[in-house]
């Protein structure tokens, strides 16, 4: 069940992917959908098959009025903490839009500081079509980055666990130690570095 969107306002949806992983950027996306060019099948990216996500990824980029990716690096995550780095990445995604929205719906329970009206929507990736679209862009983008990292470091298994702290990943991290792309403020990485 999608929530009603004001028809007289230019609305963007924003979502993030990658708060939990031990490695890589936190990736966000902002999307302004075109009401005259609807996209069927939008849903929370985590509930879609990879094949469906990839098809929707291309369709969203073609049909949206505007879209942008924002990110915060592992260094920024370590410096700011993951919550503040996520807010920064969301600000960057909104600032990257080629059209300025009048209203921004953010997935979750808090909004970054933005120069326009913003509303937090819990479970927004299932309730607001533009947030669903943003979740798909962010997830496909981040998954592709993990696959690329996997091609450079296949022994770490990034294509399988996408950087999340699975038992397999934690065992590899303990054995091989962290790469530069790891988030050094995250406890399992600190442990692998011998900091705690």
From Swiss-Prot:
It is found in: Cytoplasm. Gene3D superfamilies: Ribonuclease H-like superfamily/Ribonuclease H (3.30.420.10). Belongs to the RNase HII family. It catalyses: Endonucleolytic cleavage to 5'-phosphomonoester. The keyword Cell wall biogenesis/degradation does not apply. Manganese or magnesium. Binds 1 divalent metal ion per monomer in the absence of substrate. May bind a second metal ion after substrate binding. Its cofactor is Mn(2+); Mg(2+). GO terms for biological process: DNA replication, removal of RNA primer; mismatch repair. This is Ribonuclease HII. It comes from Aeromonas salmonicida (strain A449). Its EC number is 3.1.26.4. Endonuclease that specifically degrades the RNA of RNA-DNA hybrids. Its main location: cytoplasm.
């Amino acid at each position: 069940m999608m929530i009603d969107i004001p028809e007289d306002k230019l609305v963007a949806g924003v979502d993030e992917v990658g708060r939990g992983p031990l490695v890589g950027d936190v990736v966000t996306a902002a999307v302004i959908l075109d009401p005259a060019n609807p996209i069927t099948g939008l849903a929370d990216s985590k509930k879609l098959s990879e094949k469906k996500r990839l098809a929707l990824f291309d369709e969203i980029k073609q049909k949206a009025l505007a879209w942008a990716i924002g990110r915060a690096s592992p260094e920024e995550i370590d410096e700011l903490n993951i919550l503040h780095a996520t807010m920064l990445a969301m600000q960057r995604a909104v600032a990257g839009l080629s059209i300025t929205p009048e209203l921004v719906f953010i997935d979750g329970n808090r909004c970054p500081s933005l120069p326009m009206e913003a509303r937090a929507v819990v479970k927004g990736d299932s309730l607001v079509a533009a947030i669903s679209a943003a979740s798909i862009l962010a997830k496909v983008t981040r998954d592709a980055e993990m696959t690329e990292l996997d091609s450079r470091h296949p022994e770490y298994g990034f294509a399988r666990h996408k950087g999340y702290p699975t038992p397999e990943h934690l065992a590899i991290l303990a054995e091989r130690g962290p790469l530069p792309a790891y988030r050094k403020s995250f406890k399992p990485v600190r442990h692998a570095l011998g900091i705690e």
